[in-house]
C-alpha cells in the first residue's frame, strides 16, 4: 500500500486521479489519508477482514457481502457507516438475514483498478509470482476488478 514516506499508493494521492478510496488501514498512505480526511475525495474505512471478504464476494459474482463485523462500531450505519468525511456516501446498510439476525450489508460496486506486483509476465499478459513472499489475494483482486471491466496493472521484474 505505502511506506508512510510518500511511496506506494501515496504516489497517486491527487484528487484529480482518485475520487474514492476504500481501505481497512490508512496508516501507510498519509497523503491519501489526508485527501480523504480533508474531504477532497470520498473515503471509506472498513475492517480489513471485511474488505478482503468483500473483494472475494465481488470475484465470486455476489451482489453484496453480509457480516456482523462492525455492528455497534463506527462501521455501523447508525454511527458513521465507515465514512471518513461528510462528502462520502453511506454504502453500508442494515438488513435482517433469513434466520432473523441483523447483519451489515456491504454492497458490491465496480472496482476500476487493481495494482499488484509479480515476478514476470509474458507477451500475453500472463503473470508469475515466483519471487514474491506471499501470493495473498492477487488472483481474487484481479478477478473482482475484471468482473466489471476494470483494469489490472502489474509491476514485474521481467
For each feature predicted by the language model, list its residue ranges.
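Conserved alpha/beta enzyme-core scaffold
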Residues: 1-158
